[in-house]
């Protein structure tokens, strides 16, 4: 066991995490040159295209060190994005060490810091590495200074390397072996294995990626999953050297996969503990928690007959993504669809993109909303994740909205514009500190303001230099109201939004004005109103198209003209009673683009 090293790689998006993983795998001969491809651990197309890692992957490699010993290195690839922070913490708790990869030309960024703190809290040994030193604009000394300032770990002996050219990668592995402790654990104790990740395979069912902490996991063992209490028979165990290789057993300290004929991903939850039925472990490994969705949106098929197909696609996606939640919902405006819950905005975009790309769905998405807690007058508390389900304002005692702590990093010349943005979004400043040329700002901002367009606005006010990450803090009472949009005095449920009262007038006017541009003219007047409860706060009219009924009266008597105009008016009135206004597709997207002032 002294020769095992379990480690993962922490880095901000595009700092070269996957490329470094490729080089390490190549050096250790995990794959032949023919099988080697760029970003070998990112198996989804969408991961390669966006350059992000979504699911955790592993590689068990053997490396002959300079001291002549052969070491088993288990590389556990982690996602880097905040939406997947729970998956990151599970991957990290399966390791004893982590390589902190920092781009020498860019310095420390927000998500690196967030994941690095997670690692330090879990007691993982962090080994700093400076990547991209082959770039002409690389500034290693500045990067070392930033690591020490911002993260607060000693980085004087940070290993410089270039994952692209392969220079210095061997030094990185040597530093890793020297600094990272071997795993602790007792191979004869009752089995405890941590599920790092799980995914669905069409042939064998659910494949679980596990790190054995104590005990030994053999094929034909009967195992118990402690969080769900379900029992299964192990069919095969093995390791990935990115390719899967079967073994007879996994012992303490090793990382590998387990296949036990599980049909549903819900049974194998990330962070759960596996133990054997014969010799049960006393307690599960710490740190397991159910993942709760933070952002909700409605997904509707464009064609009503695609509803079943959408349900199937969502079911298939859920096989590989246990944190996706959905339930059927009906909207008068959009017909049948689903209310889906996501971990965050990136997660939502990825799910939408995969539905469109892998399953050929055409979707309409309603504006993303967060979960509000509503305290009623009768003392009960309701959670509301869909604006259309908000109870009657007369019965509400208080509404609590989720507040998140946002950490922002940016060069100091952009501080002013970022602070202005945060203030617009009802943020309160908690902290501000300077690290060399970088500034770290900490704000508490209502989550509802972040899901709309905060990230895009942040990138545009800072020209792409600011980076951020956020985590949920608490629910706080807030003066928010539901703004309904009425078209010819009919509520359109899919257009309702929940906004802060101070912003509601403006928001109502903007949406009404936007609708007026989008809704085509009908044969009768269309009134577009924005209302809070029964108070109308804004109104726009779409004028009717009308025929010139007086064209045939040449000169003519005034009473004759009046008669024709009255007749036209009566006809329009009748049409208005029976006519319904078709709301075009763009109207639902337009809601997303209404900027706050």
UniProtKB/Swiss-Prot annotation:
Q: Name one GO biological process term.
A: positive regulation of translation
Major location category of this protein: membrane
Q: Where in the cell is it found?
A: Cell inner membrane
* One Pfam family linked to the record: GTP_EFTU
What sort of enzyme, by top EC class, is this? hydrolase
Alphabetical GO CC annotations of the entry are: plasma membrane
Provide the function of this protein.
Required for accurate and efficient protein synthesis under certain stress conditions. May act as a fidelity factor of the translation reaction, by catalyzing a one-codon backward translocation of tRNAs on improperly translocated ribosomes. Back-translocation proceeds from a post-translocation (POST) complex to a pre-translocation (PRE) complex, thus giving elongation factor G a second chance to translocate the tRNAs correctly. Binds to ribosomes in a GTP-dependent manner.
Task: Identify this protein by name.
Answer: Elongation factor 4
Which organism does this sequence originate in? Cupriavidus taiwanensis (strain DSM 17343 / BCRC 17206 / CCUG 44338 / CIP 107171 / LMG 19424 / R1)
Q: Which gene encodes it?
A: lepA
């Amino acid at each position: 066991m002294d020769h095992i090293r379990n480690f993962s790689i922490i880095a901000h998006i595009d700092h070269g995490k996957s490329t470094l993983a490729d080089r390490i795998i190549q050096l250790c001969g995990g794959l032949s040159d023919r099988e080697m491809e760029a970003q070998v651990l990112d198996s989804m197309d969408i991961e390669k295209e966006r350059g992000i890692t979504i699911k955790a992957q592993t590689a068990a490699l053997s490396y002959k060190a300079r001291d002549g010993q052969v070491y088993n290195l288990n590389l556990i690839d982690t996602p880097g994005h905040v939406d997947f922070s729970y998956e990151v913490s599970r991957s990290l708790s399966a390791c004893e060490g982590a390589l902190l990869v920092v781009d020498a030309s860019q310095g420390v960024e927000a998500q690196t810091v967030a994941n690095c703190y997670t690692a330090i809290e879990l007691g993982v040994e962090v080994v700093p590495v400076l990547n991209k030193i082959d770039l002409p604009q690389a500034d290693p000394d500045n990067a070392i200074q930033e690591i020490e300032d911002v993260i607060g770990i000693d980085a004087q002996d940070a290993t410089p390397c270039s994952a692209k050219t392969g220079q210095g990668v061997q030094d990185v592995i040597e530093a890793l072996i020297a600094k990272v402790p071997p795993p602790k654990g007792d191979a004869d104790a009752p089995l405890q294995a941590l599920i790092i990740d799980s995914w669905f395979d069409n042939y064998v069912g659910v494949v679980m990626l596990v790190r054995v902490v104590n005990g030994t996991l053999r094929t034909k063992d009967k195992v118990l999953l402690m969080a769900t209490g379900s029992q299964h028979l192990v069919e095969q165990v093995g390791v990935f050297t990115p390719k899967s290789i079967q073994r007879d057993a996994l012992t303490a300290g090793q990382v590998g996969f387990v296949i036990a004929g599980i049909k549903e991903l819900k049974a194998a939850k990330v962070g759960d503990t596996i133990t054997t039925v014969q010799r049960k472990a006393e307690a599960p490994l710490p740190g397991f928690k159910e993942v709760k969705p933070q952002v909700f949106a409605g997904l509707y098929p464009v064609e009503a007959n695609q509803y079943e197909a959408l349900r199937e696609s969502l079911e298939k996606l859920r096989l590989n993504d246990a944190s996706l939640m959905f339930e059927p919902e009906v909207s008068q405006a959009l017909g049948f669809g689903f209310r889906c819950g996501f971990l965050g905005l990136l997660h939502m975009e990825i799910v939408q993109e995969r539905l469109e790309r892998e399953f050929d769905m055409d979707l309409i998405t309603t504006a993303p909303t967060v979960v509000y807690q509503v305290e009623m007058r009768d003392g009960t508390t309701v959670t509301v994740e869909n604006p259309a389900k908000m109870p009657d304002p007369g019965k509400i005692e208080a509404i609590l909205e989720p507040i998140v702590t946002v950490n922002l990093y940016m060069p100091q010349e952009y501080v002013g514009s970022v602070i202005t943005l945060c203030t617009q979004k009802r943020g309160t400043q908690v902290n501000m500190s300077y690290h060399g040329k970088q500034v770290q700002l900490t704000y508490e901002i209502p989550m509802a303001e972040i899901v709309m367009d905060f990230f895009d606005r942040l990138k545009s006010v800072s020209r792409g230099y600011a980076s951020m990450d956020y985590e949920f803090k608490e629910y706080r009472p807030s003066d928010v109201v539901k703004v309904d949009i009425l078209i010819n005095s009919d509520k359109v449920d899919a257009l309702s939004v929940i906004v802060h009262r101070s912003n509601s007038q403006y928001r109502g006017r903007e949406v009404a004005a936007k609708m007026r541009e989008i809704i085509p003219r009908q044969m009768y007047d269309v009134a577009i109103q924005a209302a809070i409860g029964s108070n109308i706060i804004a109104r726009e009219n779409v004028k009717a198209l009308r025929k010139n009924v007086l064209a045939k009266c040449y000169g003519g008597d005034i009473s004759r003209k009046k008669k024709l105009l009255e007749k036209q008016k009566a006809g329009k009135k009748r049409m208005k009673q029976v006519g319904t206004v078709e709301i075009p597709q763009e109207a639902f997207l337009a809601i997303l683009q209404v900027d706050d002032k």
